[in-house]
From Swiss-Prot:
Keywords: Developmental protein, Differentiation, DNA-binding, Metal-binding, Neurogenesis, Nucleus, Phosphoprotein, Repeat, Zinc, Zinc-finger. Gene3D superfamilies: Classic Zinc Finger (3.30.160.60). One of its GO terms (cellular component) is nucleus. The modification Phosphoserine is found at residues 537, 541, 559. A zinc finger (C2H2-type) spans 422-444, 450-474, 480-504, 510-534. Residues 126-151, 329-340 have a biased composition (Pro residues). The lineage of its organism: Eukaryota, Metazoa, Chordata, Craniata, Vertebrata. SUPFAM superfamilies: beta-beta-alpha zinc fingers. It comes from the Eukaryota. Belongs to the GLI C2H2-type zinc-finger protein family. This is Zinc finger protein ZIC 5. It comes from Mus musculus. One of its GO terms (molecular function) is RNA polymerase II transcription regulatory region sequence-specific DNA binding.
């Protein structure tokens, strides 16, 4: 009597066309909880019939023995029969014939409440009555699966799809744990997937899926409950799982947590006892879990990191490694922390100590070595005994310059402008103007207040004239044209033009002063190349010579004052009498003082530029 209504009520339930069409839209609501969701009975039974086919029940008894579907219990459909040790504890096992009878018969006790909230415990615990198996063509609408076990009673259901919505309208059905923080360590000890379900495509025979735990949390990381190829839009596209790479780490609930990874990496770098995202509590077990999570993060990148929280928590648990960790080697241990340097404190719990140290300015002790002119003008006996300098120390260059300018150089009342810096080569010779003395003092203090304004250059200069000449290298300006007719050569500074003029006048003011050598040249670079032939041994390194092996730049003027410590007397012939006579400027007609800048205060501005712009001269004055 019941056969016509059933066949009339759901005639196309087992047609091949419907089954083929239903594969494109896999079930998205949680079919393992028939009492927690509220779709109509006929749509619910049709969805179960599409998912739990009698042929599938015969080959995979693990599907019928679990309250949740295979996509929610982290069990892939292609893994074969589930061993008894990997089933849910507390659930009864149904053999294959009984499973077929369950699929074909109707459960009279499985009723849903009108509000779709749940069912009574007596109705949920009643086993289905045995029934003879029917062929697939004669089977009626299958009943819903068995009710959930009592271990899942701590979950609450949220149905936002409505009572009349289909499977695609339940993409927002989630199962949430009430107290996750209290049960997360316990779930991690049993290898429960803490972040989501295991996708079927990421499983492999070498890495079987771990068994679920009753107290676990089974929430899809992508926001849907369809399979890998299932339809339906993801609720959270940013957390959608990407297919696992070959040979990758099969993780439960793969989620890209770049921020957490960066925080854990910073905690490991700065030696924090726990990651920054951990609560500041005295829970010893949570500290161990956090430390294991930081260790598991070692070796992974900070961007698009697949974080396996379950493996990290299980590594820190007191129990042995779970089934999932038995197939993987333990994560590599972090490298040993370097020994604390006295200038770089890396103390546990002080993550910002290094950054605070780097923000501090570099402390320097700048000592004023200005001598007292009154003591120098005293009797010779007191002067010979040694005049003590000022010896005041300053932390910044600005303080030192202000001290020398105000207290030693003086104001307009000073009539003589003499440098009394210790070991100054001028030996008390005055300057004509105060600004010249101030520019000269920068040679002793090292002040360079004129930086290059071009980005990326980074050069600084002691005088504004030197900066003006340097900027021509960026702009390409060459305002000094050769004065001889027929020559179109242009130069960035006047000194280079003067050196070039010797080519037209046939003057050779640079000659070799070694005995027996009467060579002379029009340019100092040619003389420097010539001096290499007087070396009996191979030429030493450029640093030992004081200039490059091919000669110093053309723009550098030559000075007769050379540092004795930078000479190469050991490599020259014994015929050399005076090393300072290597580079001598011959006077042709009028006295030429361009290449031997004097320090008597009568030099022109161009000569002053060369003197202060030449780094070699600055080194010799020191």
């Amino acid at each position: 009597m019941m056969e016509p209504p059933l066949s009339k009520r759901n005639p196309p339930a087992l047609r091949l066309a419907d089954l083929a069409t239903a594969q494109a839209q896999q079930l998205q609501n949680m079919t393992g909880f028939p009492v927690l969701v509220g779709p109509p009975a006929h749509s619910q039974r049709r969805a179960v019939a599409m998912h739990l086919h009698p042929r599938d029940l015969g080959t995979d008894p693990g599907v019928a023995s679990t309250a949740l579907g295979p996509e929610h219990m982290a069990q892939a459909s292609g893994q074969g029969p589930c061993p008894p040790s990997q089933g849910l504890p507390g659930l009864f096992q149904v053999p294959a014939p009984a499973a077929r009878s369950v699929a074909s018969g109707t459960h009279p006790g499985a009723r849903t409440h009108p509000d779709g909230g749940g069912s009574s415990g007596a109705q949920a615990s009643a086993p289905p009555p045995p029934a003879p198996p029917l062929p697939p063509s004669q089977s009626s609408s299958p009943p819903p699966p068995p009710p959930p076990p009592p271990a899942l009673s701590g979950y609450t259901a949220t149905n936002s799809g409505g009572g009349s919505s289909s499977g695609k309208g339940h993409s927002r059905d989630f199962v949430l744990r009430r107290d996750l923080s209290a049960t997360a360590p316990a779930a991690a000890m049993h290898g429960a997937p803490l972040g989501g379900e295991q996708r079927s495509g990421s499983s492999s025979p070498q890495h079987p899926t771990p068994p679920p735990h009753p107290a676990g949390m089974f929430i899809s990381a992508s926001g849907t409950y369809a399979g890998r190829d299932g339809g339906g839009s993801a609720l959270f596209p940013a957390l959608h799982d990407s297919p696992g790479a070959p040979g990758g780490h099969p993780l439960n609930g793969q989620m890209r947590l770049g921020l957490a990874a960066a925080a854990a990496a910073a905690a490991e770098l700065y030696g924090r006892a726990e990651p920054p995202f951990a609560p500041r509590s005295g829970d010893a077990h949570y500290g161990a879990v956090a430390a294991a999570a930081a260790a598991a993060l070692h070796g992974y990148g900070a961007v698009n990191l697949n974080l396996n929280l379950a493996a990290a928590a299980a590594a820190a648990a007191a129990a042995g490694p779970g089934p999932h960790l038995q197939h993987h080697a333990p994560p590599p241990a972090p490298p040993p922390a370097p020994a604390p340097h006295p200038h770089h404190p890396h103390l546990p719990g002080a993550a910002g100590a290094f950054l605070r140290y780097m923000r501090q300015p570099i402390k320097r002790e700048l000592i004023c070595k200005w001598l007292d002119p009154e003591e120098l003008a005293g009797p010779p006996a007191s002067a010979d005994s040694g005049v003590k300098p000022c010896s005041k120390t300053f932390g910044t260059m600005h303080e030192l310059v202000n001290h020398v300018t105000v207290e030693h150089v003086g104001g307009p009342e000073q009539s003589s402008h003499v440098c009394f810096w210790e070991d100054c080569p001028r030996e008390g010779k005055p300057f004509k103007a105060k600004y010249k003395l101030i520019n000269h003092i920068r040679v002793h203090t090292g002040e360079k207040p004129f930086p290059c304004p071009f980005p990326g250059c980074g050069k600084v200069f002691a005088r504004s004239e030197n900066l003006k000449i340097h900027k021509r290298t960026h702009t390409g300006e060459k305002p000094f044209k050769c004065e001889f007719d027929g020559c179109d050569r242009k130069f960035a500074n006047s000194s280079d033009r003067k050196k070039h003029s010797h080519v037209h006048t046939s003057d050779k003011p640079y000659y070799c002063k070694i005995r027996g050598c009467d060579k002379s040249y029009t340019h100092p670079s040619s003389l420097r190349k010539h001096m290499k032939i007087h070396c009996k041994s191979p030429p030493p390194s450029p640093g030992a010579l004081g200039y490059s092996s091919v000669g110093t730049p053309v723009g550098d003027p030559l000075s007769p004052v050379l540092d004795p410590t930078r000479s190469r007397s050991s490599t020259l012939s014994p015929q050399v009498t005076n090393l300072n006579e290597w580079y001598v400027c011959q006077a042709s007609g009028a006295p030429s003082h361009l290449h031997t800048p004097s320090s008597n205060g009568t030099t022109s501005e161009s000569e002053d530029e060369e003197m202060y712009g030449n780094p070699e001269v600055m080194r010799t004055i020191h």
